[in-house]
């Protein structure tokens, strides 16, 4: 363990949210005692945390959780009814805080604005009414392909208000990635921006969305967010500015709501349609307001895909009851969010951190900053101006972003109002962590590391602002999380030794399953260690602190963006020059990982520099520019196990020079020599 470099101040130990909770409930030993009690008496903790967070129950739950079916089938807050919109928005209006800012936003071109809690509530009610007019009923899926901004923020609450399920899509995805997720979700509506701006360039999102819809015939309606004057032309070349949009409700086929969903993750298969009708966000948001519906606590509001190492992306399911309690706990106690805070996390509406911060901050009565664009345009000081101009007090980032900023060596004072720094997405290097703490944060802010994921609905490990910190460390498991470290023999390794992060009991934010994949859910998270959640992160413990070292699987993380190799490989083998492919993440000093593709040429086909460049373009087109491969390497064969699985870890080790480890399952060792030769020659 390194020396402690940050020690808690009275702002947190006396005046913070953890301190207030401990005083109220007679916890004299601070965070450590509270964490222990929250694990040994989880029903005691979550009942009191939900009240402290401000969860509004329309009907109080019969109990906190029902785990009689085992960890994988735990039901949280059974018998209760709620709607997260009441907890996040209406509660503040009833308390007279409707004029408080809920969202500040800014675009790369300098356009900015503020929405109050009153305005978010009113706008989300009208958008919800517009969705209702399109035939959206409780349980229907509404996808959002949007950059960060007021529309993405309002859409989240609009869907929740009427019991629709939001399907967020990364704004940098290409057509294939979008289509796969739309079809898997059976989305009925897609909301897209006409365009977004990054690095001063305009990116046409509407054309990407329309191309994806050709393969996603389940979508009945396309809603386009465009500037009302000067709308961009449609793909046919005709201007859409004066073309009548399909009226809200045109072609809609109303369906009965499905409140019985809570016990069934197998929805109806998507149905084909002749093509989506188009309307605009402006028309949608002009509808009659919809009332907020009361829902069983197990009703889903979020279907968010995460990528695995094999197969299609996995659809995780988060609910009106469990998700707000989980993220409310983390943002209230670990990030110490308060009503006068402005929270800014560098993320995208397609990733878990956007709904986590949106829901967590509004539960606290705080304000969210959403920024559309790149934070280093026109230069790297843009981020500091954003933080100062909007009075950001709680800022979250990835280690990749910190490394990028550190590499440019900006000489800029720490933002004056910052009081908490957050971090997630990947492990830190000590040099980057120290820069983030000292240079960026001015040595006065705790660095709240969080480790979780899309399927977690929040975090499993986190830092606490009431405890001292050493570089790169976590204080340990989050409140209410019964986490442990286990080796391959299912025992706890010695202090300082690495094992897998596991969880022994359910938590409120845990995904309710995988969309249309009950068996896959059980196999993925509970198959290797029955009765325990296997998270796949490699972690260790030294003293009271925990450290994260990476992943067990082959997930690729490019600048904090997660991608499974199967999606990349699908794009690569779509090229006529390629017979087989393997995608791996290779350590990169700024991005965290760079994407490398290894391709076996098709019979009689060349695979040289021109073909490699073409393949790189294919991947970027299919999955988005962020996932453009750094290298495409032609190889005669890929290393495989006896059952035919590609051993990506060996390919990665050949590039990095790491030890190859166990080769007992490798059936073609000569292939390793061929890859070594290819790396030297190309």
Regions found by a protein language model. Name each.
Residues 34-37, 85-86, 103-157, 174-179, ...:
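Conserved AMP-binding/adenylate-forming core of the ANL superfamily
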Residues 144, 169-194, 388, 395, ...:
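AMP-binding/adenylate-forming catalytic core of the ANL superfamily
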Residues 324-342, 352-393, 408:
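Conserved AMP-binding/adenylation subdomain of ANL enzymes
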Residues 224, 590, 621-646, 658-681:
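AMP-binding/adenylate-forming catalytic domain of the ANL superfamily
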Residues 99-101, 237, 263, 274-305, ...:
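Conserved pre-ATP/AMP-binding loop-to-beta segment of ANL
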